[in-house]
């Protein structure tokens, strides 16, 4: 593990604000499309400190902000966007939450990221399919004190990140203690860990492990989004529970465990909770 000066800004912001609020693909609904400049602006207006986004790479080497697998829902096409050229992608139209066609197109990542420069922190989620290219691209933007990339724990990805000597902030998706032990072996700029746990008996929530994170200034990220009725990312301390049963039953419990960042689809409500603790 390495500690880079790039990490100081986000760590200090966590301490100042109790915890940080991360907005899942921006804040969307109505005619605001996920993973767009407008969704990210909307998230910031709703109180988010971090916007989460996904990147794909066209066949001719252009990065776009998009979550692959959502092609049919967002673009009304039944084709893997990662197999399209930038010309093909630029010709596609986005569909809104009512599945009505809009005049909006997908946005190129460079344009989106430059608009967010010095405005907030940014988490790059799905991008590990083109790991080396992503790292080089992000390094070229000179925004490494704002941008955090993440990936599943994969030895090949960790080796490539270490070899790149990039100062970009990194956050692994940790599902068990064994994965945490693997990550610790690499000289990478580890700023945070996203902890995935199905129940509160997870060893990742043990006092010993949490103390290790805190002692090493590693931020703890909880994914409180409720994807559906079966996938559990944060031991049922999630958005739906927080809204249905009360903030203290979900987000509040995550805060009590010591989580420094909470990802949500409802940043304004989470900010309301934060303002009142």
Indicate residue ranges for each PLM-predicted region:
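Phosphate-group recognition and catalysis centered on beta-loop-alpha active-site segments
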Residues: 1-277
């Amino acid at each position: 593990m390495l500690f880079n000066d790039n990490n100081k800004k986000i760590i200090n912001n966590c301490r100042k604000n109790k915890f940080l609020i991360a907005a899942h693909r921006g804040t969307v609904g109505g005619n605001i499309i996920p993973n767009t400049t407008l969704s990210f602006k909307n998230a910031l207006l709703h109180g988010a400190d971090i916007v989460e986004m996904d990147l794909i790479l066209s066949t001719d080497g252009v990065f776009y902000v998009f979550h692959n697998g959502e092609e049919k829902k967002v673009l009304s096409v039944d084709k893997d966007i990662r197999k399209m050229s930038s010309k093909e992608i630029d010709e596609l139209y986005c569909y809104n939450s009512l599945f009505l066609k809009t005049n909006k197109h997908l946005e190129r990542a460079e344009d989106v990221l430059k608009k967010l420069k010095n405005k907030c922190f940014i988490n790059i989620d799905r991008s590990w399919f083109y790991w080396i290219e992503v790292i080089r691209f992000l390094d070229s933007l000179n925004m490494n004190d704002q941008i955090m990339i993440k990936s599943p724990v994969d030895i090949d990805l960790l080796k490539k990140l270490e070899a790149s000597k990039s100062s970009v902030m990194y956050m692994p998706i940790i599902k068990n203690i064994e994965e945490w032990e693997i990550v610790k072996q690499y000289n990478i700029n580890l700023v945070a860990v996203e902890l995935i746990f199905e129940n509160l008996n997870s060893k990742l929530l043990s006092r010993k492990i949490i103390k290790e994170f805190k002692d090493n200034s590693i931020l703890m990220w909880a994914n409180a989004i409720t994807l559906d009725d079966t996938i559990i990312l944060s031991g049922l301390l999630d958005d739906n529970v927080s809204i249905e049963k009360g903030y203290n039953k979900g987000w509040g419990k995550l805060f009590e465990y010591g989580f420094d960042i909470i990802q949500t689809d409802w940043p304004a409500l989470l900010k309301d909770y934060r303002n009142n603790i």
